């Protein structure tokens, strides 16, 4: 019997399948703002998900594996990072764990942390980077699909030629069984800490200083 693909292998498989879909549909755009370009890519990924028979959820809530810390700022406390974060897309399959997707114009985002934690949980994780230099290291278990664009100025607009099957895919290292076991243990500790935090008395409202 063939072994079941690991999350690492599935990330690569799905990145390759998404690239093939974008190539077959000749995905492209011209003269879009940054937000419009991101929405265009998001729609294309959602269409691929639907064609694959999956359910798509936008702005899907997720939790970081490590608990946030209670910080104090001015006259009130706050959790950093917040307890809840959001994935750009979560693609739900009937035959496997959901696929986490982040879509970013640059490396300056929380995508690396979110996708790293999803991969450590054994879930396929895709990072779609569509503009700018690639400087961030791809986390273990994550596949990055690069869709470079051209930009114009005054005003800034982005254009993307039709995707081909040569679009670059970069893979992170394999998630080792030891790393996954340690992450799952920390995840359980985080859940317990979150319950304790929820049971604490609510802090009073802002204090005028």
Label every PLM stretch briefly.
Residues 2-46:
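Nuclease catalytic cores
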Residues 69-72, 113-116, 159-160:
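Surface-exposed beta-strand edges and their flanking turn/coil or helix-capping segments
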Residues 84-86, 97-150:
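Catalytic cores of nucleic-acid endonucleases
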Residues 72, 91-93, 128, 173, ...:
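Generic detector of low-complexity/intrinsically disordered segments
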Residues 27-95:
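Active-site metal-binding core of divalent-cation-utilizing nuclease and nuclease-like domains
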Residues 130-209:
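Domain-level recognition of nuclease-like catalytic cores that cleave nucleotide substrates
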């Amino acid at each position: 019997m063939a072994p079941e693909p690991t999350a690492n292998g599935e990330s690569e498989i799905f990145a390759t399948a998404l690239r093939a879909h974008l190539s077959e549909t000749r995905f492209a755009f011209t003269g879009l703002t940054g937000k419009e370009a991101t929405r265009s890519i998001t729609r294309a990924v959602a269409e691929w998900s639907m064609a694959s028979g999956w359910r798509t959820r936008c702005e899907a809530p997720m939790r970081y594996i490590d608990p946030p810390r209670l910080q104090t700022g001015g006259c009130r406390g706050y959790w950093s990072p917040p307890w809840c974060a959001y994935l750009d897309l979560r693609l739900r399959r009937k035959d496997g764990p959901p696929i986490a997707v982040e879509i970013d114009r640059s490396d300056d985002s929380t995508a690396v942390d979110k996708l790293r934690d999803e991969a450590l949980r054994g879930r396929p994780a895709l990072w779609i980077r569509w503009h700018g230099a690639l400087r961030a290291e791809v986390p273990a278990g994550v596949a990055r699909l690069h869709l470079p664009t051209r930009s114009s100025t005054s005003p800034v607009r982005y254009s993307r030629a039709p995707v081909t099957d040569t679009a670059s895919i970069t893979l992170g290292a394999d998630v080792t069984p030891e790393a996954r076991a340690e992450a799952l243990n920390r995840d359980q500790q985080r859940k317990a800490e979150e319950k304790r935090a929820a049971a604490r008395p609510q802090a009073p409202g802002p204090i005028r200083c």
